[in-house]
Design a protein with these regions (language model features):
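Core, highly hydrophobic multi-pass alpha-helical transmembrane subunits of bioenergetic inner membranes
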Residues: 1-572
Length: 572
């Protein structure tokens, strides 16, 4: 089934890509309305939009999906239910296709909800408690976005249609469209894991690595960015762009810091994805949707390759994901090492690789734009952090001595794994130049002073040196480094966002319940209630009983006392 799915998706991807380039060349779009049924004059219509943007993105999704499924033939070879896994992945691709080619909010919701539901099934695919917790966090975080789209559908009820593409200029200044745009921004922030919804993205690493290569490169996490690219005319109209710009830059900065202090290989790559999503969101908020789309396509290719290389390493190292156990992998797995380093350099923006054409253009547009010093600093500092964690990954995994078992041997075994990586390697190298001439037939005219032109390469070199320094650093009992432990804990745990999204929600009510039961149920309530009355009665009974256990004087005194009372009563 893997081979059949691979050839089908690869063939469809090629056809759709050629069609997308043709539509781009002649500036052509197709708007299809398929009437499902007509009831008393009310039509139920399925609407599709086929323009160059949707077709090229769909072809990239199918191309990466085909290679991921082919890669799974080796990676999931010991899986008993491999066909079930492939079916779930195909449902995932179908949901993404619905989202891409729909200009209608209701059909977008079908794809959006489908992505959330199927991603939950994939995250909990390995059935253990950690996977269940990660799946629940993923599903509940994405539910917020689903609810936002549902509310926006309700707000659009008065417009006569849910095809948002009609309303860019028609009711651009209406109050309803302002609310809808804010809800769409909220939905995109949840799906693309922006602050404060970032915690589900590293948690979703509990899924199999082929799923990570698909989900965190071209599908689930980019759905929010793609939706905002479609809604980009509304962002600047309703002043949502400054908020989105700040959140995107903050997410990029937070993810870069977290990746430099993480030791789990898949989580480092997930945090790098989060950093690039923040970059896409922020450049989109600055008013460059084409540039955000260009980086989305380039990032999808080299990030899928990076995940495939990480999966090959994990597969050969008996499912060990800690980079401290790696080292000298370049001697054992040369093909994986070449692919891994090419994708890492592309992520950093190495000249003439795929990431360079989009990332360098983004940073030059940042220098050219009217933004304040804080945003400018966050952009370039985050770029340095990207180079830092990329060099740190190289340092731990490729250089030095092998830190795994001394009697252990591994190599680039597996034809399907190698084929998937090689197919993505070549397109990761050449796609940047190809896409730059396709998406921008007329290049941007950027005039910058010499020091701003060389600022990007300077920041990358300094970031790589910083990555080397933190790779060689360690805690010392004689220095003040342990005084900084709480700061490192804050920065390395995504600013405590996983805690705020999970334990914090239940922590305070449970703590309040514990202290309430301890203060009331186990103390005051118990002493004033059943246990208190029981103790009082026992005390009184023992006290009265002690009288009868005494000598004859007590009986005589009691007799005289009662006789006195009777005399007083009868005398009255």
């Amino acid at each position: 089934m893997c081979s059949l799915s691979f050839f089908s998706l690869f063939f469809m991807s090629t056809l759709i890509f050629i069609l997308g380039i043709y539509y781009l060349m002649i500036d052509y779009s197709v708007f299809i309305e398929w009437e499902l049924f007509n009831l008393n004059g009310s039509m139920v219509v399925m609407t599709l939009i086929l323009d160059w943007m949707s077709l090229i993105f769909l072809s990239f999704v199918m191309y990466i999906s085909s290679l991921v499924i082919y890669y799974s033939e080796d990676y999931m070879s010991n899986e008993k239910n491999i066909n079930r896994f492939i079916m779930i992945v195909l449902m995932f691709i179908l949901s993404m296709g619905f989202l891409i080619i729909s200009p209608n909010l209701i059909s977008i919701l079908l794809g959006w909800d489908g992505l959330g539901l199927v991603s939950y099934c994939l995250v909990i695919y390995y059935q253990n408690v950690k996977s269940y917790s990660a799946g629940m966090l993923t599903a509940l975080s994405n539910r917020i976005g689903d609810v936002a789209i549902l509310i926006s559908i309700a707000w659009m009820l008065n417009f006569g249609s849910w095809n948002y593409i009609y309303y860019y200029d028609f009711i651009v200044n209406s109050f309803e469209m302002k609310i809808i745009t804010m809800l769409i921004v909220l939905a995109a922030m949840t799906k693309s894991a922006q602050i404060p919804f970032s915690s589900w993205l590293p948690a979703a690493m509990a899924a199999p690595t082929p799923v990570s290569a698909l989900v965190h490169s071209s599908t689930l996490v980019t759905a929010g960015v793609y939706l905002l690219i479609r809604f980009s005319p509304m962002l600047n109209t309703y002043n949502c762009s400054w908020f989105l710009l700040f959140i995107g830059c903050l997410t990029m900065f937070m993810a870069g810091l977290g990746a430099n202090l993480e030791f789990d290989l898949k989580k480092i790559i997930a945090l790098s994805t989060l950093s690039q999503l923040g970059l896409m969101m922020s450049i989109l908020a600055m008013g460059y949707p084409k540039l955000a789309f260009f980086h989305l396509l380039a990032h999808a290719l080299f990030k899928a390759l990076l995940f495939m290389c990480a999966g090959s390493m994990i597969h050969n190292l008996k499912d060990s994901q800690d980079i401290r156990f790696m080292g000298s992998i370049v001697n054992f797995m040369p093909l994986t090492s070449v692919c891994f380093n090419v994708s890492s350099l592309s992520l950093c923006g190495m000249p003439f690789l795929a990431g360079f054409y989009s990332k360098d253009l983004i940073l030059e547009m940042v220098c050219l734009s009217w933004i304040n010093c804080l945003i400018f600093f966050l952009y370039f500092f985050s770029t340095g952090l990207t180079a830092s964690y990329s060099f740190r990954l190289f340092y731990y995994s490729m250089s030095g001595d092998n830190s795994f078992y001394s009697s252990f041997s591994f190599d680039d075994k597996g034809f399907y794994i190698s084929f998937g990586m090689i197919a993505l390697l070549f397109i990761s190298v050449f796609s940047g130049s190809l896409l730059s001439w396709l998406v921008f037939p007329i290049p941007y005219m950027i005039v910058l002073p010499f020091y701003l032109k060389f600022l990007t390469i300077t920041v990358v070199i300094l970031g790589s040196y910083f990555g080397y320094l933190i790779s060689n650093s360690s805690f010392s009992y004689n220095l003040f480094s342990f005084d900084m432990l709480s700061s490192f804990s804050f920065l390395g745990s995504m600013w405590f966002m996983p805690f705020l999204s999970t334990n914090f929600i239940s922590y305070l009510p449970l703590k309040f319940g514990y202290y309430s039961s301890k203060s009331f149920d186990y103390s005051w309530g118990e002493m004033l209630g059943g246990q208190g009355l029981y103790s009082l009665f026992i005390y009184m009974i023992n006290y009265i009983q002690s009288w009868y256990d005494s000598n004859f004087k007590i009986y005589l005194l009691t007799f005289i006392f009662w006789m006195f009372i009777l005399i007083v009563l009868f005398s009255l």
